[in-house]
């Protein structure tokens, strides 16, 4: 968003322009040819990469059927929004930055500011919509499967654009100060104090708080599931070490009841270790081995499977079995830890990139209108902060799509033109 105009990072009569050029009384700087060339190359590269990256995401979702689901519809809509930023907003912003003054007239300036605020706000709110969708998916997976419909995605997308529209239109309807249009060489957003609070909180601070809460809860829910899986595996390992194994299914029933069986105390514990028998063995409370004896009807008599004697019993070999269980439990613990680290890393990248790109801009956008006479913002720093926010439109497709293996496969198909051959 165009909160700081080039050359107007401060309001002093002798301000430093970009790359050390000297400003005049209005803060507009004459720039050198080398500055214009370097700035044009840097900003041109940024715009080209942003257009290419977001266009590839849109093409991948449109061409690859496996990517056509509600979660990816939101990512696709984010890519369309960032593509609009890259095509409709960034070229005019780059021209303004390179020339260091506005040359396209007041009407175009109003349109530029409105598009800037609309598209950038919608892009930020799309990140909230994606966070909300992920939160519902992980905290209510069973019910949300039926609720996660294209219609719901369309409602979320429409809401992002509606809020963006409500934030971008007021300055065009007069919510601005007279000084906002006093300089024909400058094009800046309204510095009205009421609008400043309304726009910065609506476009950034409230969405930021919402994303922090949602991703915090997503992390807690994911960590709970991961640790629950580990505990379940550890319980299974403990059961195996304590000597519990499932009894074999009986072939016949006793007295008409399938699976007739009875428990008898056996001599396993007295022999100094578990004994292998023809029944399932478990430990009693007193440490004695209890052996399940399958009872079968043979003719008219009931026969019990013979209990093995202490001397003739075949000793089991639980050591290797227990070691295997311990290895499996340890492997699951390591996998769970790796998954937890990956969750932290992913959420850290998402929130870290968003905050890094937009927080400096919105701090300046909120503070500067309230201290115009006393605040000093170097012009170069103002330009860097401004374009750091714009660069979020370049980084979004990298974070939300290029790290996804399904998207990577679709991109490879696009590069190899496999979609063209299929048609």
UniProtKB/Swiss-Prot annotation:
According to its UniProt entry, one GO biological process term is: serotonin receptor signaling pathway
Transmembrane region positions? 39-59, 74-98, 108-132, 153-174, 194-216, 347-370, 379-403
- Disulfide pattern: 109-187
Q: How does it assemble?
A: Heterodimer; heterodimerizes with GPER1. Interacts with YIF1B. Interacts with GPR39 and GALR1.
Short motif (DRY motif): ranges: 133-135
What the protein does comes down to: G-protein coupled receptor for 5-hydroxytryptamine (serotonin). Also functions as a receptor for various drugs and psychoactive substances. Ligand binding causes a conformation change that triggers signaling via guanine nucleotide-binding proteins (G proteins) and modulates the activity of downstream effectors, such as adenylate cyclase.
Q: Where does motif NPxxY motif map?
A: 396-400
Task: Pull the Extracellular topological domain ranges from the record.
Answer: 1-38, 99-107, 175-193, 371-378
Composition bias, Polar residues = 7-16
Q: Which SMART domains match?
A: 7TM_GPCR_Srsx (SM01381)
In its UniProt entry, what is this protein called? 5-hydroxytryptamine receptor 1A
Give the membrane topology, semicolon-separated if more than one.
Multi-pass membrane protein
| Any GO MF annotation of the entry | G protein-coupled serotonin receptor activity
Q: Where is this region: Disordered?
A: 1-20, 235-277
Tell me which GO cellular component terms the UniProt record holds: dendrite; plasma membrane
Q: Which UniProt keywords apply?
A: Behavior, Cell membrane, Cell projection, Disulfide bond, G-protein coupled receptor, Glycoprotein, Membrane, Receptor, Transducer, Transmembrane, Transmembrane helix
Cytoplasmic compartment segments: 60-73, 133-152, 217-346, 404-423
In the UniProt record, the gene name given for this protein reads HTR1A
Report the superkingdom from the record. Eukaryota
Q: Which residues are glycosylated?
A: 10-11, 24
Which residues does 1D-myo-inositol 4-phosphate bind?
A: 345-346, 352, 403-405
């Amino acid at each position: 968003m165009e909160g700081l105009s080039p050359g107007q990072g401060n309001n002093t009569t002798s301000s430093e322009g970009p790359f050390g050029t000297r400003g005049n009384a209005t803060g507009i700087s004459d720039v050198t040819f080398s500055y214009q060339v370097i700035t044009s190359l840097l900003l041109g590269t940024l715009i080209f990469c942003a257009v290419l990256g977001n266009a590839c995401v849109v093409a991948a979702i449109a061409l690859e059927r496996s990517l056509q689901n509600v979660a990816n519809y939101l990512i696709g809509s984010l890519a369309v929004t960032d593509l609009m930023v890259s095509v409709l907003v960034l070229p005019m912003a780059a021209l303004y930055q390179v020339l260091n003054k506005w040359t396209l007239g007041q009407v175009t300036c109003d349109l530029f500011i409105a598009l800037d605020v609309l598209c950038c706000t919608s892009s930020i709110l799309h990140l909230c919509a994606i966070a909300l969708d992920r939160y519902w998916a992980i905290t209510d997976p069973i019910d949300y499967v039926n609720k996660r419909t294209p219609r719901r995605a369309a409602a979320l997308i429409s809401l992002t654009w509606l809020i963006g529209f409500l934030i971008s239109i007021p300055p065009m309807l007069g919510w601005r100060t007279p000084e906002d249009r006093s300089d024909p060489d400058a094009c800046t957003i309204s510095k009205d104090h009421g609008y400043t609070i309304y726009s910065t909180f609506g476009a950034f601070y409230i969405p930021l708080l919402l994303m922090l809460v949602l991703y915090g809860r997503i992390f807690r829910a994911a960590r709970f599931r991961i640790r629950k899986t580990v505990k379940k595996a550890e319980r299974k390992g403990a059961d195996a070490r304590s000597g519990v194994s499932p009894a074999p299914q009986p072939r016949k029933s006793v007295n008409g009841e399938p699976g007739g069986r009875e428990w008898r105390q056996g001599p396993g514990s007295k022999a100094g270790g578990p004994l292998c028998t023809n029944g399932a063995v478990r430990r009693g409370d007193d440490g004695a081995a209890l052996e399940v004896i399958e009872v079968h009807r043979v003719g008219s008599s009931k026969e019990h499977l013979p209990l093995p004697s202490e001397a003739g019993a075949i000793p089991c070999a639980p050591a290797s079995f227990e070691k295997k269980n311990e290895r499996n439990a340890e492997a699951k613990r390591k996998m769970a830890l790796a998954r937890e680290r990956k969750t932290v890393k992913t959420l850290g990248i998402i929130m870290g990139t968003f905050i890094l790109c937009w927080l400096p801009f919105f701090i300046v956008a909120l503070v500067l209108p309230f201290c115009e006479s006393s605040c000093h913002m170097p012009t170069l720093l103002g330009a860097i902060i401004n374009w750091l926010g714009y660069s979020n439109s370049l980084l979004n497709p990298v974070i939300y799509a290029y790290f996804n293996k399904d998207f990577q496969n679709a991109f490879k198909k696009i590069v190899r033109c496999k979609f063209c051959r299929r048609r």
